[in-house]
């Protein structure tokens, strides 16, 4: 089952967008094969965070994380940042050799920024490249507006739901943006 062609999908929820000031409060991972078939779902963890980080969230984060139940899960969590990092690495090791999978997801550069600051060992588990579904979305918006308008995200803003949505979105773009003769 371990393959350097497997893909690691990751999503983080944070208290804001500033990787220097805000905190990761949820992490989830999924491993797929190269054809985007799900091989395994990693642990989904709300990460304990000092209350002042939650109190400092902007209106968007306060509303969305509150409505989804994430804020309450974070307040009740006993999982530290270090524990979440190590549990995630432990989950990934049987599926992908270190340094082989690009970091996969939507707007994944933002997640990478937070990982560099708060989970550097996990960030180093990934290849330096990204497989960012939002890049395809931006190209479709500019060059194939019909394709762009054909996919609607639900936007749950829970880490695991967002990963599955990103995988489905990439499948959609694969089917609708790339020429059939180049698909396997």
UniProtKB/Swiss-Prot annotation:
Signal peptide: none annotated. 3'-to-5' exoribonuclease specific for small oligoribonucleotides. It is found in: Cytoplasm. Belongs to the oligoribonuclease family. This is Oligoribonuclease. One of its GO terms (molecular function) is 3'-5'-RNA exonuclease activity. One of its GO terms (biological process) is DNA metabolic process. The keyword Ubl conjugation does not apply. The lineage of its organism: Bacteria, Pseudomonadati, Pseudomonadota, Gammaproteobacteria, Thiotrichales. It comes from the Bacteria. The gene is orn.
């Amino acid at each position: 089952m371990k393959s350097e062609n497997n893909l690691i999908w990751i999503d983080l929820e944070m208290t804001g967008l500033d990787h220097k000031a805000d905190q990761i409060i949820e992490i989830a991972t999924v491993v797929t094969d190269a054809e985007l078939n799900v091989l395994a779902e990693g642990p989904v963890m709300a990460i304990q965070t000092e209350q002042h980080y939650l109190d400092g969230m902007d209106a968007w984060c306060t509303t969305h994380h509150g409505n989804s139940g994430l804020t309450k899960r974070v307040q009740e969590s006993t999982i530290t940042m270090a524990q979440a990092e190590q549990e995630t690495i432990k989950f990934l090791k049987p599926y992908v050799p270190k340094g082989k999978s690009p970091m996969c997801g939507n707007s994944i550069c933002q997640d990478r920024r937070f990982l560099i600051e708060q989970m550097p060992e996990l960030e180093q588990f990934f290849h330096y490249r990204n497989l960012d579904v939002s890049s395809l979305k931006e190209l479709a918006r500019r060059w194939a507006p019909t394709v762009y308008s054909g996919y609607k995200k639900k936007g749950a803003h829970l880490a695991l739901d967002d990963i599955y949505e990103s995988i489905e979105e990439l499948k959609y773009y694969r089917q609708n943006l790339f020429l059939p003769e180049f698909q396997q």
